[in-house]
């Protein structure tokens, strides 16, 4: 009975960044600023898309959901990491660990599906512009978003449930700044064969499907763009896809570096920082700064707020 209950009472110690105690104040301030900007940027983008009717299109529906998932990823990782900079023992309970992993897995799985959906949306817009409203309707984009959240939740629940079957008795020290699946396997005294099998059965097909969708979509886009005779048409097509292509490239490069085999565990921390903290910070700016529709929507909201503020001041006087 004691052995069966062992995994229910275990606590872990997150030792990521513990080698940089002299920089803990600087790192705390840096990551606090990143966290604040990430949450404001992503939730601000979600609010903007919700409030502006002109942004109620498939591309922005996917973008709003991506921003929501980036906020989820940041909220799952950063608060505990900030707490640990000044924590004496750096402990995290099994329950907290599973919750953190669940939301991280949910966010990253949803990101994969959403980036693939956005690539398909760009493919339809550039390669089949006359059929865009029938092939990629608002209703279909909402259905795809709902399907993404259902699939991502199921994927997260499967892996979290499999983690709970493990007994952790080798060590409590996780050589990372958050609870992730592979570092937890190293601490298990239960054979993680079933867990690893679930990775091959569920995670690998998701990666293959989403990466293939992105690659095929952009291959078709490039072929279509190179066939265009108009330079203006080419420029418009490239500018339409540039932000998404850049975002999806850094996401998958970091993902493949992070999940790839490595003998040096210290490599996982900087790649993990970029993958889970920096990318959610960059995405709202990548998609917004050169996007005229988003910039115009921001100006409209600011103008409306300014008019409302001036009207309120006039009434008060």
From Swiss-Prot:
Q: Where in the cell is it found?
A: Cell membrane
Q: What is this protein called?
A: Olfactory receptor 5K17
**Residues modified by glycosylation:** 5
Functionally, this protein is described as follows: Potential odorant receptor.
Give the UniProt entry's GO cellular component terms.
membrane; plasma membrane
A biological process (GO) of this protein is: G protein-coupled receptor signaling pathway
Q: List the disulfide bonds.
A: 97-189
- Cytoplasmic topology: which positions? 50-56, 115-144, 220-239, 290-317
What residue intervals traverse the membrane? Answer: 29-49, 57-77, 94-114, 145-165, 199-219, 240-259, 269-289
Q: Specify where it is mainly localized.
A: membrane
Q: How does it sit in the membrane?
A: Multi-pass membrane protein
Q: Which UniProt keywords apply?
A: Cell membrane, Disulfide bond, G-protein coupled receptor, Glycoprotein, Membrane, Olfaction, Receptor, Sensory transduction, Transducer, Transmembrane, Transmembrane helix
An example of a GO molecular function for this protein is: G protein-coupled receptor activity
On the tree of life, the source organism's domain of life is Eukaryota
Give the record's family classification: Belongs to the G-protein coupled receptor 1 family.
Residues on Extracellular side:
1-28, 78-93, 166-198, 260-268
């Amino acid at each position: 009975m004691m052995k069966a209950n062992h995994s229910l009472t275990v606590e872990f110690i997150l030792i990521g960044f513990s080698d940089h105690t002299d920089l803990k104040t600087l790192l705390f301030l840096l990551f606090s600023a990143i966290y604040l900007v990430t949450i404001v940027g992503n939730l601000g983008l979600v609010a903007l898309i919700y409030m502006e009717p002109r942004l109620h299109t498939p591309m922005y529906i996917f973008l709003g959901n991506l921003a929501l998932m980036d906020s989820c990823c940041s909220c799952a990782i950063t608060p505990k990491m900030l707490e640990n900079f000044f924590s004496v023992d750096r402990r995290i309970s099994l329950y907290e660990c599973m919750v953190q992993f669940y939301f991280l897995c949910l966010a990253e799985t949803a990101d994969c599906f959403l980036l693939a959906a956005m690539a398909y949306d760009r493919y339809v817009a550039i390669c089949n512009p006359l059929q865009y409203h029938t092939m990629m309707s608002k209703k279909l984009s909402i259905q795809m978003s709902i399907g993404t959240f259902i699939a991502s939740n199921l994927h997260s629940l499967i892996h979290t449930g499999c983690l709970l079957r493990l007994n952790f008795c080798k060590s409590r020290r996780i050589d990372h700044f958050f609870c992730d699946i592979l570092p937890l396997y190293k601490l298990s005294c239960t054979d993680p064969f079933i867990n690893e099998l679930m990775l091959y059965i569920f995670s690998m097909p998701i990666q293959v499907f989403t990466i293939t969708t992105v690659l095929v979509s952009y291959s078709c886009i490039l072929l279509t763009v190179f066939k265009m005779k108009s330079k203006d048409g080419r420029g418009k097509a490239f500018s339409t896809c540039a932000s998404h292509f850049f975002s999806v490239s850094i996401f998958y490069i970091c993902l493949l570096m992070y999940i790839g085999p490595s003998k040096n565990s210290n490599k996982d921390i900087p790649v993990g920082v970029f993958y889970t903290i920096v990318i959610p910070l960059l995405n709202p700016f990548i998609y917004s700064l050169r996007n005229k529709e988003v910039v115009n929507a921001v100006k409209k909201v600011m103008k409306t707020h300014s008019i409302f503020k001036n009207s309120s001041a006039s009434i008060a006087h």
